[in-house]
Every structure is written in structure tokens, then in C-alpha cells.
């Protein structure tokens, strides 16, 4: 059985040092830096199912941000304004520290003028997610294609329509692509 912990590696004067930050006898994984680089967020299953935690770089001041019980939290990411985004039970959620998680409502708007069968696409089953640097858009992969949705409006656009499986989505630092 795997039991991952989180470590910090530092390089000073061509010498690398390692410091163990978490030591839970289970899974702690997927760390991401906070905006101030003085702490980090990560996923831990220490309370039964994976949830989002935050702690300082020395492992102190640990705080649990989400409290899901049925299923694990997956695909943790963060925007430059501190908005965290994650997958839970096939849906996409966002949360800011000290607030309750919000499910991202996703609906598809089309420009089609012909009478065609319109498929309703929901975020259920999304396999990867990424938050734009300003926190206003969320990209996700659903059934192998990339979609982008607004966190402020009910607009979702399908970006790709290929036979290939898309993967490893992310926003450019300027948020334009």
C-alpha cells in the first residue's frame, strides 16, 4: 500500500536538502503553493476521504478547507487570486479559504441555426480541470474534449472536437490561452 507524504526540497550552495512536511500514515499528495508562497494546499485522506488541507511550510497551522465524506476530492488547482478548483463526484467545484465550496454550473450555448439535436453537457465525468489565473474561467476535459466555462455566467464552450483524447490542460500565465 502507498502512503505518500509531502516534502520540500531546497538547493543552497550546490547542495540539496530535504525536509519532510507531513507524516500522516496514509495519503498526503498533490501540493500546490499558496499565493504568498508561505504555505501550501494539498489533498489528504486523514479524515477518511481525500479533502483539501492547508499548512505552513514547516507543517504547522494545518487547516482542513473541505469536508466531503462520500467521495475523494481530486484534481486540485489554484488561480492567482486564491480561488481553488477541484473535482468531486464527477462535478467541478471552487472554494476560497474560509468559504463554502461552490459547484460550478455548466451549460452549453451554441450558435447553431439548423434544427439539430442539442446534447446537454454537464461537468459530471470530467477527468481534468484547470482554473484561469484570474479565476473567472474553468477548463475541463469531458469525454476526451476540452470545454471552457465561466464562473460568473452560464456560458460553456467546447474548444476541441477530435477523435484523440485531450489531456494535460492548463491556462497560459496571461490567461488568454
Locate each region found by the language model.
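Acidic/charged, solvent-exposed loop-and-adjacent secondary-structure segments enriched in E/D, K/R, S/T
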Residues: 103
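Extended repeat-based solenoid scaffolds, especially LRR ectodomains
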Residues: 130-136
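A flexible loop/linker signature enriched in serine peptidases of the S9 family
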Residues: 1-7, 15, 20-29, 34, ...
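Flexible glycine/proline-rich, aromatic-decorated loop/lid segments
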Residues: 63
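Signature of short aromatic-glycine-proline-rich micro-motifs recurring in repeat-based ectodomains
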Residues: 121-130
